[in-house]
Amino acid sequence: MKKIEEIADFGPLPSAAQLAYHRDELAAFIHFGINTFYEQEWGNGQEDPKCFNPTKLDTDQWIRVLKETGFKRVIVVVKHHDGFVLYPSRYTDYTVAASPWRDGEGDLLAEISRSASQYDMDLGLYLSPWDAHSPLYHVDTQKAYNEYYQQQLEEILSNPLYGNKGKFVEIWMDGARGEGAQKLTYEFEAWFETIRRYQKDAVIFSTEATELRWIGNESGRAGDPLWQKIRPEKLSEQTPPVYLCHGDPEGTYYSVGEADVSLRSGWFYHDSQQPKSLADLLDIYLASVGRGTPLLLNVPPTKEGLLAEVDVQRLQEFHQVISSLYDEDLAAEAEVTSSSERADYPASNLTDGQRDSFWAPNAEETSYVLEIDLGRSCTFNLLEIREPIAKGQRVAGFILEVKKEDGWTVFARGQTIGYKRLLLGEMVEARYLRLILTDFQALPLLSKLGVYRTPAIMEEEKRPSGLVLSQAASTVIGGQSSQISLRRLDGLEQAEQIRLVTEPGTGTHGTAYEDQIWNVTFAPGETRKELTLSTLAFTGQQELNFYLCASREDGRQSRIKIKVKGS
């Protein structure tokens, strides 16, 4: 038997767990707790546990819906910054045991674990390091607090009743810490050791150099370019969001940037909020999964303990469109030729439908060209490229062209590819495509090239909002207010109420802004309204941003980015 030539690895490589998360693509966040009943985002630790009483709690519904709509893992918030715990912990009385829910005998973590085990849904744990309730959360008692946090980790991770059949795939350590909170030094290494002792296969999300990093914003959008590697010495609570968003082309540690965003404006459920539009979700998908990184979408349950019907419907619509994107790969089994290829790694591997096969060139050159013949003229507007990321991320520049009657025309160009790159362009008709690799850190390898036509609903969702949001000043100093103008361009013959809400970006609730909601009523013929948007002061020279979203009664939306500078 002929021995297949082995291609050398390059740079930091993903672990089996990181590679599995790349392949999962979609994860769900569940924010549910005492904040849900106070309709707030961040509690102060003084909320009354007796307010926690979800009368129709159904974790089977949560997991079933998420499973049916394409999510592969669920990260459940067991303790948020307020310190309220969703299981009866031995180390604090600020738990569900102090609530009227289940007559004080309930254990929400056990319930969602049973549901996850029943539906075989991977489960992750969010346990906030910042705890506004604990009297130990003070620099003078930080050793005792670190032990307290570690005890809770052990209590959860060692319990076979918790997790999907006792297993957690991800541990989430949020780096958020409110203005004025004590600046404790966390004993991360001791915590990490505890996690690996009980859940050795779990990936860890933290501000340190762990398997997962924050993507640098809460809008669910990865940077472009996006490198799934960093330099460990550059990671801390003070790491600039832009570094996290793009990664580091010279990175020495493989780090998956997790793109998190909420289905609604807030992380916890509020009656006054609505789910994002389908168009928004599709845009977020293309800017996260479409840039090679997992999307972590928060779906907050109601006070009753159910996923809201309107949210379920939006998830179903989202799943239907995403699934239909890949219904027909026009490049399946298409003929591919290349300027260079190795016998064991031919260009035909790009369209053979096999996950683990890939193309490799035969010689080191300054650029490489691959040409795809679809066999017939096809209409398409979405292209997919993949690298075999298990061998290391390599490509740093590419151009995609289509051949028209007058010659080759650029369809898209970019820098990084990574696990998966989706490139959405204008609808074109062509038989031949050409991929030119212009820059790479090592011998480039590619595992897939797909060609698709997006479903018609994606075009329908692009309808203009008929709203214009503008800001008096392009940038605001934190702590100052910004004057916002809202103009209505259509539907002027009718009265209309437009809702405006704040949404996170690189700046989050409690750092750059406090959540604000306006219900603005336009009279018939009225076209313009003015409002004042407040921001929060923060120290440092960095610039943060968040969004103001305006929603019409027919579901159309418009957004403006608010830039805030520190002082």
Predicted ranges, named:
Residues L424-M427, T535-A537:
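Short, flexible loop/turn segments at beta-strand junctions in immunoglobulin-like
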Residues G375-S377, P388-A390, F440, L489-E493, ...:
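Short solvent-exposed strand-capping/beta-turn motif centered on an Asx-Ser/Thr pair
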